[in-house]
Amino acid sequence: MTEENDLEMLEELVNRGISLQREAKHKEAIVCFNKAISLDENMNGEADSNLLRLKNNSLMKLGRDE
């Protein structure tokens, strides 16, 4: 994959995760955020704090913490 493709995929995963959160589908949102976090770590060496926050929001809605 090229960096441009990676950025597009990252954006799609984040947008999908946010949409799922709005639908209260937090387990599915977490899957998207985990993929986005992994991709971001591969691209930048660490995950963006906003991605981690988005995932944490869904975890809290499910009564979980990581």
Where are these regions (language model features)?
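TPR-adjacent "capping" and linker segments in tetratricopeptide-repeat scaffold/adaptor proteins
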Residues: M1-E12
